[in-house]
Structure formats: C-alpha cells, structure tokens
C-alpha cells in the first residue's frame, strides 16, 4: 500500500462524517505520490499525517439579536490549517451549509493555493452557518460584531488574516474590522477585502474573476491560441462570475450564459457584466428578498431566462466553461454534456466546483482542466498584496495591483505546467498544481522540525 493511500484510509476511518474534506484530501493525495517517491524523507517525518490535520480549530457560538428583538444563535468556526510558510490566510464563509468538514476541505485547499501564489501565506478558513440572505443591514452588523467578539482573540496581522468568501463581502468585512478595532484599540491589517477608505486594495473585488481569466488565457497562449472569438459559459453570477465575464469580453470572448440558484440566463449578444453587477448589488442590499438573476432580462430583452437548476448552462455548446459558484456544481453528466458540445477548456473559479468523477472525465477526453487551487488564486493573491500595502502604509494604483495580479497568475500557470511535465504528466494541471503547492509547504515543514 502506498504512503498516500495509507494516510487517506486513516482519514476516511477517522472522519466519516466529513465528506467534503475527504473529497479534497482524496483529490490531493491521489496526485502527489510521484513527489513522495522522489522524497522518502517526507514519509520518515510523517509529513502527510501532519499536513492533513489542522494546526488548530476554533469553534464558538455566535449569539445576536434580530430586528424583532429575538435572540438568535449560530455556530462560528476558524480552521487554522497550516502556518509553515506564513500566517494563516483564507476567507470567512457565511452560509447555512457551513460545517466543520466543509471548512476543513476549504482550509486544506487554501494551504496549497496560497503556496502556489509564491507569497508568504499559510492556509486557513472559517465562517458560520449564518445566512445573510434576506437579513437587514442592522442584523448583519449585529451578527458580524458578535462573530468578531470571539474571533478577535485568535487572529492578527502576523498570526491569522481572514478575508471574505461566500456570503462575506465588503460590508461584512467592514463591520468585523470595526469591531476588531473597537476591541483591541489597534488599527492593523488584520482583515483583507477592506474598503478603500480604510486600508483596502484596489482590484481586490475584481481579483478572483480577473485572475481566473488570466490563468486560462496563459494556457491558451501557451498553445498558440487566445480568448478571441471563443464562446464561454459561466456557472454563477456573484463576484467571481461578474469580473470573469468582464475580463473575457475585454480579451475578445463572449459569455453566452450565467446562473444563480433560481435558474440561468442566456444572452445571444453576450452577457453584459454591468447588468450582472447591478442584479448582484440588488441581491446584496437585502431590500427586496425576491431579487433573482431573472431581472437581467428586464434590461436585456434579447436574453432568455430559464427557471430551474442553474446547471442548465452546462448544456450549451461552448469552447470554455468557467464554474464560478460553489462546490460540486459540475457533475459527471454535466461534463459529458460539455464534452459532447465541444468544450475544450474548463477553469475553476470556485473552490472544488467539479466532482472528482467529472474531473476524470474531462482529463480522459482531452479537455484542459484548470483546478481551482491555481485558477482561482487571484483573490487570495491580491489579499496578500493588500497585506503588503498595509504593512508598508502604502496604497498602490489599480494598474499596479492588476499588473502584479496578471504577472503572478500567468507565472503560476507556467509553474503548474512545468511541474506536470517534470513528473511525466504533461497537461495534467491537477497533478501539477498539487505537487507544486505541496513541495513548498513540505520543505518548509521539514526544515522547521516536528511541530
């Protein structure tokens, strides 16, 4: 039995109630055995056993008062996974589906993702089962303040620097930052994704979507191709999707469709990111609980709204597919439909949106598959640049930040591509990303001794 299989079997026996975490561990451990074969010292130091267990998990209750004066209680978490190469870094997710197993999966992915950025950032993830949808600004402020009243004890600019994620945007980050400052009497860059008036970075909002497209574009360039004239479908309509749509259009491609939890919209003229952004902001405001992506067709009469499962976008003929919503939203049958309809490239804008079965199908059928831990690293990359600006008490221009983002994302593609070639798996970007990210963390852990 291989070292990776032994560790994976132990994880499955220990955490049977954490399927998302097991899925992430399976995807990673299933591809890094060649690196372990080349470095037997990793097994001697029980490095994998240490890598797959978080350094620390913080769990706490979050009591808050709603607009009716009723006390509500949610559960809060922070998984501080690995700090071998820098302070813990990773987002906070507010969503009813949040569980410890989900955050462990996201945290493990974050460790390798942050390693790939080349910036000194460890990996972590956190959040709560609080649902911000339909809540008033006052309720969200009360919740964020209560959440930070416990979390502040465990974070800091050189310890753990959270950011936003699903359900946590600039508003929520601002409320949490204000509470942290109030509790500590200290202004530090303890959160990223802040507003521009108090230490935020230009291009942070656009970073994940732009970075995804830069990464895919560098793949296309390496094969003598480009986005020019390409038809693209996007699953999702949130922050990542909006700016992926914008950047695809800037590079000459056309996004045919995007989706939300209520259905999907198809626009033969190409999805207009400004309308998409307007709908997203209406949803986020909380003033109208009935807002869905169907509003898009009110401003774009040529567009067609399809009620139902947003996964309908995968049935369209396209050259490139960009899943930008959430985990496990591109299934095997979706992969089969995409391949049958001529899709040649898939780039993950979300965290693990593609199931292992779908990923395997893409790889077996010649589709270039760009895993999220590399392709969607633009957000955390610019978070790292925000940390640098805060530490230096500087503010860079949009062009400076975007230029660094583009340079690092394009460089990241070549690191992943070259690593896959080095281990005899040219075109296997999953293996390339996992091994490249793993080696940096593994060497740092080995150098620091048993800790």
Segments predicted by a language model, with ranges:
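Active-site nucleophile and cofactor-binding loops and adjacent substrate-binding regions
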Residues: 69, 165-166, 201-208, 233-237, ...
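Glycine-rich phosphate/diphosphate-binding loop of Rossmann-like nucleotide-binding domains
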Residues: 200-315
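Rossmann-like adenosine-cofactor binding region
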Residues: 263-369, 374
